[in-house]
Protein backbone atom coordinates (compact mmCIF):
# COMPACT_ATOMS: atom_id res chain seq x y z
CA UNK A 1 0.00 0.00 0.00
CA UNK A 2 2.77 2.42 0.92
CA UNK A 3 4.62 1.56 -2.30
CA UNK A 4 1.56 2.48 -4.38
CA UNK A 5 1.29 5.83 -2.62
CA UNK A 6 4.99 6.43 -3.14
CA UNK A 7 4.72 5.67 -6.86
CA UNK A 8 1.54 7.73 -7.24
CA UNK A 9 3.27 10.91 -6.07
CA UNK A 10 5.91 12.23 -8.43
CA UNK A 11 9.38 12.64 -6.95
CA UNK A 12 10.55 16.19 -6.33
CA UNK A 13 12.93 16.03 -9.29
CA UNK A 14 10.03 15.48 -11.68
CA UNK A 15 7.80 18.15 -10.14
CA UNK A 16 8.33 20.42 -13.18
CA UNK A 17 6.67 17.77 -15.39
CA UNK A 18 3.52 17.73 -13.24
CA UNK A 19 1.46 19.97 -15.61
CA UNK A 20 2.58 17.79 -18.54
CA UNK A 21 1.34 14.65 -16.77
CA UNK A 22 -2.02 16.37 -16.23
CA UNK A 23 -2.32 17.07 -19.99
CA UNK A 24 -1.15 13.66 -21.30
CA UNK A 25 -4.53 11.86 -20.91
CA UNK A 26 -6.16 14.52 -23.13
CA UNK A 27 -3.92 13.80 -26.15
CA UNK A 28 -6.12 10.96 -27.56
CA UNK A 29 -9.10 13.33 -27.43
CA UNK A 30 -7.15 15.84 -29.52
CA UNK A 31 -6.45 13.10 -32.09
CA UNK A 32 -10.16 12.25 -32.20
CA UNK A 33 -11.02 15.91 -32.71
CA UNK A 34 -8.35 16.23 -35.40
CA UNK A 35 -9.76 13.20 -37.24
CA UNK A 36 -13.26 14.70 -37.11
CA UNK A 37 -12.08 18.10 -38.40
CA UNK A 38 -10.10 16.39 -41.17
CA UNK A 39 -13.12 14.36 -42.26
CA UNK A 40 -15.31 17.47 -42.16
CA UNK A 41 -12.81 19.29 -44.38
CA UNK A 42 -12.80 16.51 -47.02
CA UNK A 43 -16.58 16.16 -46.84
CA UNK A 44 -16.86 12.81 -44.98
CA UNK A 45 -15.88 10.73 -48.02
UniProtKB/Swiss-Prot annotation:
State what this protein does: One of the components of the core complex of photosystem II (PSII). PSII is a light-driven water:plastoquinone oxidoreductase that uses light energy to abstract electrons from H(2)O, generating O(2) and a proton gradient subsequently used for ATP formation. It consists of a core antenna complex that captures photons, and an electron transfer chain that converts photonic excitation into a charge separation.
> What's any one GO cellular component for it?
photosystem II reaction center
Identify this protein by name: Photosystem II reaction center protein K
An example Pfam family from this entry, by short name, is PsbK
- Family per similarity comment: Belongs to the PsbK family.
Task: Name the cystine pairs.
Answer: none
* Self-association state and partner proteins as the record states: PSII is composed of 1 copy each of membrane proteins PsbA, PsbB, PsbC, PsbD, PsbE, PsbF, PsbH, PsbI, PsbJ, PsbK, PsbL, PsbM, PsbT, PsbX, PsbY, PsbZ, Psb30/Ycf12, peripheral proteins PsbO, CyanoQ (PsbQ), PsbU, PsbV and a large number of cofactors. It forms dimeric complexes.
Amino acid sequence: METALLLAKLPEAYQIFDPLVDVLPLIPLFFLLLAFVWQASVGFK
